[in-house]
Design a protein with these regions (language model features):
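N-terminal exported-region signature
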Residues: 1-17, 21-264
């Protein structure tokens, strides 16, 4: 642990300890780089000052896991990498841990010709329809049962708290989000408007907006009173690409189904 930590090494600094706590401030000087290794955890209870921009603070990710940061400072620029495990063409749920990552021209958007080994697929779920809406569907015609992307996702950036469905033609790529880290309360409006399929009414795709895991079993830190009560708790569904099916975890349960844990 450290009281204060200042990154001023010309070669950069890499944090490799499993759990590190900085009890006061972290400062990253201009032109310097501070990396948190994959599967390592950093907590900063004071202020983070990053003069190195997105490239100066990097959270790594690989097959071992993803770096975690718990902090309280607003608008910290950083690059958060995400290792995508599984086979080519598997589907994954994801969300952005930064507030200002532009979707277009990022490593997450559809590119190339689907099926040639270079393409990506990106969708959002539209509960009122209900249907999956493709990022490349920018047709000027948008109907109630077949909305286009600009209708359901009018912003250019990933939306904090919104979940996305993602597939890639490569095996185990590492993509990244770059921008200001989300911090504090994040609100995302949910809907219960679907009339076309009663089995899907009220299902919304929500994502973890932070650069650290969140615990579905935690009794505080949430506002979930508008969710459907299930045995006194709340159910969440997560897609498991290894089994090609959803798993369910109830906030009062000790285990989930289909390999799903309580950590998002």
């Amino acid at each position: 642990s450290f009281y204060n930590l200042t990154i001023d090494n010309a070669l950069g600094v890499t944090l490799s300890s499993t759990q590190t706590i900085i009890t006061n401030n972290l400062s990253i000087n201009s032109g310097k780089i501070f990396k948190i290794e994959a599967a390592k955890n950093l907590t900063v209870t004071g202020v983070i000052s990053n003069s190195g921009g997105n490239e100066g603070f990097i959270l790594e990710s690989n097959v071992a896991g993803t770096a975690s940061l718990i902090h309280t400072t607003l608008n910290v620029p950083a690059t958060v990498k995400r290792y995508i495990s599984g086979n080519a063409e598997d589907w994954h749920f994801l969300a952005s841990p930064v507030s200002n990552q532009v979707i277009a021209s990022s490593s997450w958007v559809p590119a190339g010709t689907y099926g040639n080994g270079t393409g990506y697929d990106l969708y959002v779920f539209d509960e009122p329809t209900p249907c999956w809406v493709y990022q490349l569907n920018t047709s000027p015609t948008s109907t109630g049962e077949n909305p286009n992307w600009p209708t359901v996702h009018p912003t250019a950036n990933f939306v904090s708290g919104r979940g996305y469905l993602y597939s890639v033609q490569a095996s185990n790529p590492t993509n990244q989000f770059a921008g200001n880290l989300n911090n504090g309360a994040v609100s995302y409006a949910v809907t219960k408007n679907s009339t076309l399929d009663p089995l899907l009414i009220g299902f919304n795709l929500i994502g973890n907006p932070y650069p650290s895991a969140i615990d579905w079993k935690a009794s505080s830190g949430w506002t979930r009173s508008n969710l459907l009560d299930s045995g006194g708790g709340y159910d969440m569904w997560i897609w498991n690409p290894a089994t090609n099916n959803y798993g369910v975890y109830n906030s009062l349960a000790s285990t989930g189904t289909n390999g799903i844990s309580n950590f998002i």
